[in-house]
Amino acid sequence: MTPTYMNIMLAFTISLLGMLTYRSHLMASLLCLEGMMMSLFIMTTLIALNTHSPLINIMPIILLVFAACEAAVGLALLVSISNTYGLDYIHNLNLLQC
């Protein structure tokens, strides 16, 4: 395993540990989730470049689309919670039910 892949896996692991550590705050969780998605994007891009397969070249773009959708939904939820309660605690998500 090359050092590049090890660094990307280390970035993913650190983001995952941050997600587990700061799971009570929505903003920190969203930032850690973005770090995980960015490391996955870089990993799939490197794999697509190394395999030279035309079928796998679309995978990084699909992952980037899902990351953008996740960021938009997370930001909308963060704004909604911040405007309503003034805090970004995840335990406030139960209070958003109809």
Swiss-Prot record:
Group of enzyme by EC: translocase
UniProt-listed InterPro entries: NADH_UbQ_OxRdtase_chain4L/K (IPR001133), NUOK/Mnh_C1-like (IPR039428)
UniProt membrane topology term: Multi-pass membrane protein
Gene3D superfamilies listed in its UniProt record: 1.10.287.3510
A single Gene Ontology CC term: respiratory chain complex I
Keywords: Electron transport, Membrane, Mitochondrion, Mitochondrion inner membrane, NAD, Respiratory chain, Translocase, Transmembrane, Transmembrane helix, Transport, Ubiquinone
Segments traversing the membrane: 1-21, 29-49, 61-81
Principal subcellular localisation of the protein: mitochondrion
Protein name as it appears in the record: NADH-ubiquinone oxidoreductase chain 4L
